[in-house]
Amino acid sequence: MNTLRFPAGLYGVTPEWDDTSRLLAAVRDAAAGGMRALQLRRKHLSREQRLLQARALAPLCRELGVTFIVNDDWRTALEAGADGAHIGRDDATLAEVRAAAPGLLLGVSCYADLNRARELLAQGADYIAFGAVFPSPTKPQAAHAPLALLGEAAAQVRACGEPRPAVVAIGGITPANAGLVAAAGADSIAVITGLFEAPDIRAAAQACAAPFPLTD
C-alpha cells in the first residue's frame, strides 16, 4: 500500500498572469492532460488581487478534481475555499498555520535541506518540496537540490506511516526531464514554465504526468 496525503504526478504552479480568463482556460487544458494539483503563486500581487484569482480558481479546481493550493498565504487559502497552502521559509511556521487552519493541506519548502524536511515532517507536513532540481527560469539564483536528495527524502516519508507525506520536486522541470525526477524518488513535480508556457499545454501536461503512476 502506498497512499499519499497529496496527489502524485503533475502539480502545476501558476505563471505571473494577470489575465484570469486566460489562466482559467490554461488550467482546464492542464487538467485535461493529467494535472492533479495546482498552486496559485502570485508573488507580486496585493492580497486583495490574489484573493480574487484564488476565488476564481477554487471552484474550477473543484469541478476538475484538482487539489488547489495557495502559495505563501494561508488566510487567502481559507477565504477562497482552497484545499491547502504552501509555506516557505519566511512565512508563518507550520505549527502556527496548523493550529489556525486545521483543515488545510500544508506543503513546505525544504530547498536542499533534509534536516529541515525531517523537522517539518515531525510537525505534520503533508508534502515536502525540494528544489531547484534543475536550473530554474523562475528562480535563477535558487540553490541546487541534487536528484539523489529525492531518494533520501523518499526514505524519510516512508517512515511516516499511511497515508504518508509526498515528496515534491521543483525547479526547471519539463516534459523532457520529468522521468528522471520520478525515477529519483519524487511523488510529484511542480512545474511552471514547462507547463503553462508550452505551445500545447494539454500535451505538456500529459508528458509531465506520464512517468507517475496514480497510486494515491
Curated annotation (Swiss-Prot):
Cofactor dependency: Mg(2+)
Keywords for this protein: Magnesium, Metal-binding, Thiamine biosynthesis, Transferase
Binding site for 4-amino-2-methyl-5-(diphosphooxymethyl)pyrimidine: 39-43, 71, 109, 139
MF terms (GO), sorted A to Z: magnesium ion binding; thiamine-phosphate diphosphorylase activity
Pfam families: TMP-TENI (PF02581)
GO CC term (a single one): cytoplasm
UniProt record, GO biological process: thiamine biosynthetic process; thiamine diphosphate biosynthetic process
Coiled coil: none
Positions that bind Mg(2+): 72, 91
Keyword Electron transport in record: no
Cofactor binding: number and manner: Binds 1 Mg(2+) ion per subunit.
Intrachain S-S bonds: none
Catalytic activity: 2-[(2R,5Z)-2-carboxy-4-methylthiazol-5(2H)-ylidene]ethyl phosphate + 4-amino-2-methyl-5-(diphosphooxymethyl)pyrimidine + 2 H(+) = thiamine phosphate + CO2 + diphosphate; 2-(2-carboxy-4-methylthiazol-5-yl)ethyl phosphate + 4-amino-2-methyl-5-(diphosphooxymethyl)pyrimidine + 2 H(+) = thiamine phosphate + CO2 + diphosphate; 4-methyl-5-(2-phosphooxyethyl)-thiazole + 4-amino-2-methyl-5-(diphosphooxymethyl)pyrimidine + H(+) = thiamine phosphate + diphosphate
CDD domains referenced in this protein's UniProt entry, alphabetically: TMP_TenI
Highest taxon in the source lineage: Bacteria
Pathway: Cofactor biosynthesis; thiamine diphosphate biosynthesis; thiamine phosphate from 4-amino-2-methyl-5-diphosphomethylpyrimidine and 4-methyl-5-(2-phosphoethyl)-thiazole: step 1/1
EC number(s) given by UniProt: 2.5.1.3
InterPro entries hit by this protein: Aldolase_TIM, ThiamineP_synth_sf, ThiamineP_synth_TenI, TMP_synthase
Residue numbers binding 2-[(2R,5Z)-2-carboxy-4-methylthiazol-5(2H)-ylidene]ethyl phosphate: 136-138, 172, 192-193
Recorded family membership: Belongs to the thiamine-phosphate synthase family.
Function: Condenses 4-methyl-5-(beta-hydroxyethyl)thiazole monophosphate (THZ-P) and 2-methyl-4-amino-5-hydroxymethyl pyrimidine pyrophosphate (HMP-PP) to form thiamine monophosphate (TMP).
Name of the protein: Thiamine-phosphate synthase
